[in-house]
């Protein structure tokens, strides 16, 4: 198991720089890519990926499984649960992304991938 802080890195000159919003998501996906991880778990404050904002419609339930393409469409439509760049790195090696809730770790979340 690898734990790594996110949202920062170094530029081509070695200068430390901060990533934009969602940078921690991308950092995690890239780290999973680099170490050939079996999966990348993205822990957040919602129960997984939803078809729409769960705060606007609290009766909906998270989606159990999504393909990369299905997740891409949801993220392109404005879902902010995961940075879209994560899908690029996960798709390159077929690494599943599992979106889970930090405050409700007993829930399975949403599995994205092949």
Model-derived regions, located:
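C-terminal catalytic "cap/lid" subdomain
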Residues: 1-114
């Amino acid at each position: 198991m690898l734990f790594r802080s996110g949202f920062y890195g170094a530029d081509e000159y070695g200068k430390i720089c901060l990533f934009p919003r969602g940078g921690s998501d991308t950092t995690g996906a890239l780290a999973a890519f680099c170490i050939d991880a079996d999966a990348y778990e993205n822990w957040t404050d919602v129960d997984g990926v939803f078809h729409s904002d769960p705060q606007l419609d609290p009766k909906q339930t998270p989606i159990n499984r999504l393909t990369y393409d299905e997740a891409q469409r949801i993220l392109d439509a404005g879902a902010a649960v995961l940075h879209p760049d994560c899908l690029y790195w996960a798709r390159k090696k077929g690494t599943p992304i599992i979106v889970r809730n930090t405050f409700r770790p007993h829930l399975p979340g949403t599995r994205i991938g092949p």
